[in-house]
Structure formats: structure tokens, C-alpha cells
Regions:
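Hydrophobic beta-strand residues in large extracellular and virion-surface proteins
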Residues: 9, 58, 88-90
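Short secondary-structure junctions
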Residues: 29-38, 86-93
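Vicinal oxygen chelate
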Residues: 15, 50-51, 64-65, 69-104
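N-terminal beta-strand motif that seeds the catalytic metal site of vicinal oxygen chelate
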Residues: 1-23, 28, 67-71
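Conserved short beta-strand elements that form part of the metal-binding/catalytic scaffold
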Residues: 31-67, 107-108
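Extracytoplasmic/periplasmic beta-strand context in beta-sandwich domains
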Residues: 7, 43-45, 98
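Short, basic/low-complexity N-terminal boundary segments at the transition from targeting/disordered tails
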Residues: 27-30, 77-78
Length: 108
């Protein structure tokens, strides 16, 4: 069987200034912004996260502000099949990930 785990918590912020949003959430969560993380670029800011915890990422978006989870799997097709059997549906297939929606409407 393949392996999957909670990989990241993304805080989607409808803002023109992702740096201000990242600083706010860093202070709320008692962390720093990690400017050297390879994920800190463009519309994304990574917060300092211990290696045994899910990544916390601030993302500038144009839709309403919300929070979403990223699930990491070593076999994406198998994980999509498993989640579909549980009642999730595919919303979009992108280059390296699949956006899905839970039966209760949350996207992940």
C-alpha cells in the first residue's frame, strides 16, 4: 500500500502584500518567516517549521481567504483512487498535484 500524510497547511490570503500577511501569521503562530526556504518565492512565503511538523505556507490568492490542507503521497494515482472511494471528487489536475474536494465541500 502507498503512503500518504499531511504535508502542509496553506493559509490563502486575498491580499496585495503577501509579506505583510506572512509576518502576521508568523507572529500569530510564534514562528519566523523563512526567506531561504526554496518555497519562498512569488506568491508564497514559508514559515519556519520543525522538520517533524507539516509545513505552514502563506499563499497570496485572488479568491476569498481560507485555509487548506495539502496531503503528500508517494503514489498520487493510488491516493486519488483511495480518496475518490471515500467520497472525494477531483476538481482539477495540475502539473504535480490534484485538487480534490471532500463530500462536505473543503478543497485539499
Amino acid at each position: 500500500m502507498h503512503h500518504s500524510r499531511l504535508c502542509a497547511l496553506l493559509i490563502d490570503c486575498n491580499t496585495l502584500n503577501v509579506d505583510e500577511a506572512a509576518q502576521f501569521w508568523a507572529e500569530v503562530l510564534g514562528r519566523g518567516v523563512d526567506p531561504k526556504h526554496p518555497g519562498t518565492r512569488g506568491n508564497y512565503r514559508m514559515l519556519e517549521t520543525p522538520p517533524d511538523e507539516p509545513i505552514v505556507e502563506i499563499q497570496r490568492v485572488e479568491h476569498e481567504s481560507r485555509v487548506h490542507l495539502d496531503i503528500e503521497a508517494d503514489d498520487i494515482a493510488a491516493e486519488v483512487a483511495r480518496l475518490t472511494k471515500l467520497g472525494a471528487k477531483v476538481v482539477d489536475r495540475l502539473e504535480r498535484w490534484v485538487v480534490m474536494e471532500a463530500p462536505t465541500g473543503q478543497r485539499f
